[in-house]
Amino acid sequence: MAEAKALPRFKKLYNENIRKALLEEFKYDNEMQIPRITKVVLNMGVGEATGDSKKPAVAAEDLGLIAGQKAVITRARNSIATFKLREGMPIGTKVTLRQDRMYEFLDRFITIALPRVRDFRGLNPKSFDGRGNYAMGIKEHIVFPEINYDKVDQIWGMDIIVCTTAKTDDEARALLRAFNFPFRQ
């Protein structure tokens, strides 16, 4: 018999508290209209990849440690002579998180990584795209506890995109606030 997996803390919070609160706040007709987080995309652009082809592999390894699943190396779609970039060259790395891994990552990100960011004053509440998705950037990937600071040869920045089923930014903002995203006032 298979062992029962523990339900991630944020998933439990969403199912037990957040769904009810959003249903009351926005007066949805159907429970399927309640916004939920569908995926989290982590992206690292490696600008120095044109000079050293090993850098994207190192960045992908670090991103894999942060995300808990293997990262994919992204390649250039077209050539840009000014940047010495050729089509098909590795220029970054990304990983898409869904389901339990997504909730576990968000939990670690909000409770552990964000408080470790230097001069952190809160997330920008205007970084929504108009369709209920939220994007943010981090200047240093070493804020995550999975990264061993002594073994890091270069500090990378990264983008974190939270995709939701919310129709408007206000619904998405209410959803992320319920997950304790620390937005600036």
Swiss-Prot record:
Keywords: Ribonucleoprotein, Ribosomal protein, RNA-binding, rRNA-binding, tRNA-binding. One of its GO terms (biological process) is translation. GO terms for cellular component: ribonucleoprotein complex; ribosome. It holds the Pfam family Ribosomal_L5. It comes from the Bacteria. SUPFAM superfamilies: RL5-like (SSF55282). PROSITE patterns: RIBOSOMAL_L5. InterPro entries: Ribosomal_uL5, Ribosomal_uL5_bac-type, Ribosomal_uL5_C, Ribosomal_uL5_CS, Ribosomal_uL5_dom_sf, Ribosomal_uL5_N. One of its GO terms (molecular function) is rRNA binding. Belongs to the universal ribosomal protein uL5 family. PANTHER family: 60S RIBOSOMAL PROTEIN L11-RELATED. This is one of the proteins that bind and probably mediate the attachment of the 5S RNA into the large ribosomal subunit, where it forms part of the central protuberance. In the 70S ribosome it contacts protein S13 of the 30S subunit (bridge B1b), connecting the 2 subunits; this bridge is implicated in subunit movement. Contacts the P site tRNA; the 5S rRNA and some of its associated proteins might help stabilize positioning of ribosome-bound tRNAs. NCBIfam families: PRK00010.1 (NF000585). Part of the 50S ribosomal subunit; part of the 5S rRNA/L5/L18/L25 subcomplex. Contacts the 5S rRNA and the P site tRNA. Forms a bridge to the 30S subunit in the 70S ribosome. This is Large ribosomal subunit protein uL5. It comes from Brucella anthropi (strain ATCC 49188 / DSM 6882 / CCUG 24695 / JCM 21032 / LMG 3331 / NBRC 15819 / NCTC 12168 / Alc 37) (Ochrobactrum anthropi).
